[in-house]
Amino acid sequence: MTFLSTSAFSPLAFSLGLLLVVATAFPTPGPLGGDATSNRLPLTSADKMEELIKYILGKISALKKEMCDNYNKCEDSKEALAENNLNLPKLAEKDGCFQSGFNQETCLTRITTGLQEFQIYLKFLQDKYEGDEENAKSVYTSTNVLLQMLKRKGKNQDEVTIPVPTVEVGLQAKLQSQEEWLRHTTIHLTLRRLEDFLQFSLRAVRIM
């Protein structure tokens, strides 16, 4: 089976792809009847992010169900051992994203950094997933769109941590060398952790 990689496309084509995802996934809301040009409420930045997060969560849910049905990758306690070897992002109290102690700029910085850290795992998901390739690609691409939206919203982008290239190369090699069971386990853990991360992010976006 041949898999498509975003590295095969030019930056322009990739950017157009990201815009296409937003345009097709989130049509401009209009009234149910009458003049479509009147009474239209434009989406705010927070509204767009909320809808995009919900969209990604829906795709994650579909992929998790497919993995459970096809590969028996459901909620498995054995995966805890594999998870210890992964550096998947998660939100904590100190990140300022919870209702108690909420800090918008600190939270935005942490969510942006976390999504940046997820990218290598989501690229692996897109390249290696053996089920619904479109859903896998959509999770990777849509998360990139969300990342760009958050970068535009935040004021402290200098504080966003970008993964060290040499570390990413080493991690990529480690992921690529995995055998089938561990590869499926890594993908499932990535989906679970991203789902948790986005659910907390969604709550934070709603109070921004």
Swiss-Prot record:
GO cellular component: extracellular space; interleukin-6 receptor complex
Keyword Nuclease: no
Cross-referenced InterPro entries: 4_helix_cytokine-like_core (IPR009079), IL-6-like (IPR003574), IL-6/GCSF/MGF (IPR030474), IL6/GCSF/MGF_CS (IPR030473)
Cysteine disulfide links: C68-C74, C97-C107
GO molecular function, one term: growth factor activity
Subcellular compartments: Secreted
Keywords: Acute phase, Cytokine, Disulfide bond, Growth factor, Phosphoprotein, Secreted, Signal
Transmembrane regions: none
Subunit structure comment from the entry: Component of a hexamer of two molecules each of IL6, IL6R and IL6ST; first binds to IL6R to associate with the signaling subunit IL6ST. Interacts with IL6R (via the N-terminal ectodomain); this interaction may be affected by IL6R-binding with SORL1, hence decreasing IL6 cis signaling. Interacts with SORL1 (via the N-terminal ectodomain); this interaction leads to IL6 internalization and lysosomal degradation. May form a trimeric complex with the soluble SORL1 ectodomain and soluble IL6R receptor; this interaction might stabilize circulating IL6, hence promoting IL6 trans signaling.
Function: Cytokine with a wide variety of biological functions in immunity, tissue regeneration, and metabolism. Binds to IL6R, then the complex associates to the signaling subunit IL6ST/gp130 to trigger the intracellular IL6-signaling pathway. The interaction with the membrane-bound IL6R and IL6ST stimulates 'classic signaling', whereas the binding of IL6 and soluble IL6R to IL6ST stimulates 'trans-signaling'. Alternatively, 'cluster signaling' occurs when membrane-bound IL6:IL6R complexes on transmitter cells activate IL6ST receptors on neighboring receiver cells.
Protein name in the entry: Interleukin-6
Lineage: Eukaryota, Metazoa, Chordata, Craniata, Vertebrata
